[in-house]
Curated annotation (Swiss-Prot):
SUPFAM superfamilies: alpha/beta-Hydrolases
Xref: InterPro entries: AB_hydrolase_fold (IPR029058), NDRG (IPR004142)
Main localization category: cytoplasm
Gene name, Swiss-Prot/TrEMBL: ndrg4-a
Cellular component GO terms held in the UniProt record: cytoplasm; cytosol
UniProt function note: Contributes to the maintenance of intracerebral BDNF levels within the normal range. May enhance growth factor-induced ERK1 and ERK2 phosphorylation. May attenuate growth factor-promoted ELK1 phosphorylation in a microtubule-dependent manner.
Regions annotated as coiled coil: none
Taxonomy of the source species: Eukaryota, Metazoa, Chordata, Craniata, Vertebrata
PANTHER family per the UniProt record, alphabetical: N-MYC DOWNSTREAM REGULATED
Source organism of the structure: Xenopus laevis
Entry-linked Pfam families: Ndr
Similarity comment: Belongs to the NDRG family.
Residue segments, region Disordered: 356-390
Full protein name: Protein NDRG4-A
Biological processes per GO annotation: positive regulation of ERK1 and ERK2 cascade; signal transduction
Length: 390
């Protein structure tokens, strides 16, 4: 995507405007020093991301119109604040998908302000019983329609949704059906497109040529990651094979590959266009198999309330490989929504010079609030999609 025009410098938390051409923007963070601690270690052991820091979580099985949902929750609703609700990708569960991210040290500054609710897709949690033969797995639309039962059970008034892959699709569908229940969204590796007969046939052929775990791995990781057979890939191969019921996984995989198009359109591009109304942060690794799909999703969203985060040196699971960068971006996102105004941003502000280059599409009448670091007097407002490379 070609980015032109307007440039803004971010240094020590200050935005210094230059010339302007409205539109799409890109924010780059040159690496003067590693943002993540321990970057020489690719990932914790499999045991760590499956079991660490689980003592504060409480498990629930919640009845919904389309079957039972396994949910784990930490904390209690805090006044009128939304809950952070997550939904994992196909082949994973909440532990495999989110433990590394939510156990990251700097995330604790966020989670102490919100109740956190992880939803496992039916039959995908660790130790799940196998569904009986002939069981009809819920459609992707039905998976989205199960979530109001979760919110009602815990008394959530609204949510900030974090979804990855298939989970991002489910949460986007939920937000389209129940926009009043969603305050903000972080959508990682989302594919907004439906699967046609050609896609279905290709996935069938691929499935015949390889085992289910290998097929799922090709969805989660880039070809480069798979060819290098990194420690991360080896860990996930083992966990997908041993910690997720394979029969249940096959049902979820089949349903995800039968999904319909989300049918979103950027406002003003089509009569009666519908899109996500809440602020959205799209996230994808620059080496992820979903990169093109996320770029396409960005073209379907309202540019006045969308941030596009493209993470450098990150493959298919940025929440696992780059939890520090994603945590910091999530803090900015929450601050833009008016939450956590005093949260510390000093590490990013002190260690980086960022340039914001814009060029784009639609003039927005609603300003997108930017965040302030502890060292800044003020930051300007941005009225267009912001693409962030870090």
């Amino acid at each position: 995507m070609k980015l032109l025009g307007h440039k803004i410098e971010l240094w020590a938390g200050l935005l210094l405007p230059d010339v302007s051409i409205s539109g799409m923007s890109e924010l780059r963070f040159p690496e003067e020093k590693p943002l993540l601690r321990g970057q020489d270690t690719e990932m914790e052991s499999a045991d760590t991301f499956l079991s660490a820091a689980d003592t504060d979580w409480k498990e629930h099985d919640i009845e919904t119109p389309y079957g039972m949902l396994h949910v784990v929750i930490r904390g209690t609703p805090k006044g009128n604040r939304p809950a952070i609700l997550t939904y994992h990708d196909v082949g994973l569960n909440h532990k495999l998908c989110f433990n590394t991210f939510f156990n990251y040290e700097d995330m604790q500054e966020i989670t102490k302000h919100f109740v956190v609710c992880h939803v496992d897709a039916p039959g995908q949690q660790v130790g799940a019983s196998q569904f009986p033969q002939g069981y009809q797995y819920p459609t992707m639309d039905q998976l989205a329609a199960m979530l109001p039962s979760v919110m009602q059970h815990f008394g959530f008034q609204s949510i900030i949704a974090i979804g990855v892959g298939a989970g991002a699709y489910v949460l986007a569908k939920f937000a389209l059906i129940f926009p009043e229940l969603v305050e903000g969204m972080v959508l990682i590796n989302i594919d907004p497109n439906g699967k046609g007969w050609i896609d279905w046939a290709a996935s069938k052929i691929s499935g015949l040529a390889s085992s289910l775990p290998e097929t799922v791995l090709s969805h989660l990781f880039s070809q480069e990651e798979l060819m290098n057979n990194t420690e991360l890939v080896q860990n996930y191969r083992q966990q997908i094979s041993n910690c997720v019921n394979q029969s249940n996984l096959q049902l979820f995989w089949n349903m995800y590959n039968s999904r319909r198009d989300l049918e979103m359109s950027r406002p003003g591009t089509a009569p009666n266009a519908k899109t996500l109304r809440a602020p959205v942060m799209l996230v994808v690794g620059d080496n992820a198999p979903a990169e093109e799909c996320v770029v396409e999703c960005n073209s379907k969203l309202d540019p006045t309330n969308t941030t596009f985060l493209k993470m450098a040196d990150s493959g298919g699971l940025p929440q696992v490989t780059q939890p520090g960068k994603l945590t910091e971006a999530f803090k900015y996102f929450l601050q833009g929504m008016g939450y956590m105004p005093s949260a510390s941003m000093t590490r990013l502000a002190r260690s980086r010079t960022a340039s914001l280059t814009s060029a784009s599409s639609v003039d927005g009448s609603r300003p997108r609030p930017c965040t302030q670091s502890e060292s800044s007097d003020g930051i300007g407002q941005i009225n267009h999609t912001m693409e962030v490379s870090c």
